[in-house]
Every structure is written in structure tokens, then in C-alpha cells.
């Protein structure tokens, strides 16, 4: 598997994991929100992490960092509309923070509105300084490092670096299947959608833990590098903007890998949208990806009530 997940990519994803729009880019500390529906996944903590989980606002959306306890938050559809399909939603944030609102809750609510049980995965993150000033300084330092040539990680290094995230994703899938009857879910129709770093988590789970048997995967503005496709790889739906500053203009190896392996694949390259657009950047065709995704799920038999 040829897949670059380096320090520079972490920094870039961190900078761009929130929507690029004319809003306040300052990081403002906020109170930790109540998460009464969040279910601990019991996957352990984070080695060397002493700082508590912290929440803040940037670009007008809720973010969190220093996550040491992975959780899964259900967004269940109206039983009258439920299709039986389920999706694990993995937000992005460069593995240093999570864009919970833009790439988590909003997406999950949109899925539930369409009859799909959605589950926002708050996965464990890399440690950052406890105080916001220290966090901002560490981000600045990382940006400076990202400007320098980066060593390409080996496949084993890349997967090893995402061990916590893969474990959290596997636990999330296992929990959804274990409670399928309670949540009125077809265990054979559990897929995963991930944004940026969440897309990398989705792909890493698919490649390193094929025993999760995901029914489908949707990496949204994730890496397009070629991979070694598992024999039982699930159907893939991928989205990217042509002006994505991280992943555009680097070829479409991921798509070609799925094609060459003879696996179902659909790819949407939108003219504009940048990176971190969530459900879509207003004024661009990237706002159409969610409907395209719904159509693709339906065409692949994922939304048929059984």
C-alpha cells in the first residue's frame, strides 16, 4: 500500500478541516457541551495524554481536541422512515482535533432525515497542550514544519500511526452490529463515511481491518493515493473538489486501485469547494455531493427497506 500520512499532512488537514468561509478564524474556548447520548467505546486512553478533553469554536462551528475516550453518538431516524441502513460518521481535524459540528452532527442529522441511522464517532486524538495559547503555538510550529520536505511513511508506519483510530472505528462498527435489533438496523448494511482525517481513518480501517466487513465506504476529501485493495473490499464512493489544496492535482490512484481490483467505485470531482466543506460549500456544486451519495446508496440496494 502506497499511502502518505506524514506530519505535513496532519498540519494541512488541521488547518483545512473546517469550512473556508468569511467567518472568525480565531479559536475561542467554549464550555464542554452535554453529550447525553454519547456511548463510551471502552477502547482505552491515549499514551502520554495528561490534558483533559477541551472544546472550542472556530469558523463558527464546534470543535474538540485532546480526546482520550472514544464515544459513539447515535442519530436515529424516525421509525416510519427508517431504511435499516447505518453509517459511522468520522469527522476530520488532522488527528489533533475533530470538527464535530461541521463534519459530524450536521452530517448525521442529514442522514437520519433520510432514514439512515447515523453514529458520530468521536475517536481518540494526538495530545496537544492543555492551554489554548500552547495549542495555537503548536499549530504554528507544525505549519512551519509542514513547509519543509516530508519523508514519506512506509505502509506499516502509516497504519501503525493510526492504531487508536482504527481500534475506535472497529469498536464502533461492532457496537452498532451488537445493538442492531435495538436500533432497527440491518447488520449487513453498516458503512462508514469519513471527512479528511476521518476519510483516512475510514480507509485505514478498510485496509488494515477488513474483518469489519463494512457494507460501503465514503471517503470525503481524503487522500487519492493508490492502495492495495483487499479481496473483499466494499463499494467505494469518493468526493473531492478540484481546488482542494491538500489532495487535488495528485492523480486518482485510489479510484484506479478500486477499478483495477474490479470493485464497485463512484467518484465525484467537483469544480470547487476547497477542503473541509462538510455538506457542501455554498455557491459551489460541492453542495450536491450528499444527494449524489443518497442516489448511489439507493442504486446499490442499501436503502431498500427489508
Regions found by a protein language model. Name each.
Residues 62, 136, 259, 264-306:
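C-terminal catalytic histidine-bearing segment of alpha/beta-hydrolase fold enzymes
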Residues 163-233:
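Primarily recognizes the serine-hydrolase "nucleophile elbow" in alpha/beta-hydrolase
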Residues 90, 220, 270-273:
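Alpha/beta-hydrolase
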Residues 17-19:
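N-terminal signal peptide c-region/cleavage motif recognized by signal peptidases
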Residues 38, 45-71, 78-87, 92-183, ...:
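Serine-hydrolase catalytic machinery in alpha/beta-hydrolase-like enzymes
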Residues 243-248:
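Acidic catalytic loop of the alpha/beta-hydrolase fold
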Residues 238-240:
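Short beta-strand/loop motif that positions the catalytic acidic residue
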Residues 1-9:
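Bacterial N-terminal signal peptides that target proteins for export
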